[in-house]
């Protein structure tokens, strides 16, 4: 099976039944009433992040996919809907708008061991700590962080007290589910 510009998700599913279920992006959230913190993690089974890739691309915001030469042939063969969307660190900036630290656990095919990176926001000095780990991980990455769910954030997320609903542009079904979960927490 060869990917090309005209490959659709349906073509992929026919060639590889259950691929989307087996390689789904997993999002996990938890809330502690005792601490008032929300714990959030996103796990994928993508290409992972090597230590070199981390140093060259994640520590330098604004470096886009076209500059990542090692992936260019692979990306060009991908249909547009499958190409990477991240590029400029906007996701990282968003995370650091609610928390001071982010932990990334990742395994790349180009390395024998997994990596663990902890990034701290500019408010905490902007440090990044990286280490190889003996932890057994499948190829892919997990990004995890926690944040205190303040009254202001509760209002921002749920739209209570006449506030602007943060989730208003999200698909209605997803919006209702997220709002239901947040209202349960709050």
Question: Where in the sequence are the language-model features?
Answer:
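GHKL (Bergerat-fold) ATPase N-terminal catalytic module, capturing the glycine-rich phosphate-binding loop
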Residues: 1-155
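Glycine/threonine-rich ATP-lid/beta-loop region of ATP-binding domains
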Residues: 108, 138-186
């Amino acid at each position: 099976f060869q990917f090309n510009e005209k490959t659709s998700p349906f073509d992929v599913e026919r060639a590889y039944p259950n691929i989307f279920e087996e390689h789904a992006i997993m999002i996990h959230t938890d809330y502690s009433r005792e601490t008032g913190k929300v714990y959030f993690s996103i796990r994928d089974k993508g290409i992972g992040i090597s230590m070199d890739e981390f140093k060259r691309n994640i520590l330098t915001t604004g470096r886009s996919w076209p500059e990542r030469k090692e992936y260019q042939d692979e990306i060009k063969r991908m249909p547009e809907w499958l190409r990477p969307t991240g590029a400029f660190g906007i996701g990282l900036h968003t995370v650091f708008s609610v928390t001071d630290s982010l932990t990334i656990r990742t395994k790349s095919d180009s390395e024998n061991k997994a990596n663990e990176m902890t990034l701290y926001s500019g408010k905490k000095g902007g440090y990044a700590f990286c280490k190889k780990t003996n932890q057994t991980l499948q190829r892919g990455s997990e990004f995890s962080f926690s944040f205190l769910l303040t009254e202001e954030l509760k209002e921002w997320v749920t739209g209570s007290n006449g506030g602007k609903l943060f989730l208003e542009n999200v698909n209605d079904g997803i919006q209702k589910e997220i709002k239901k979960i947040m209202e349960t927490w709050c």
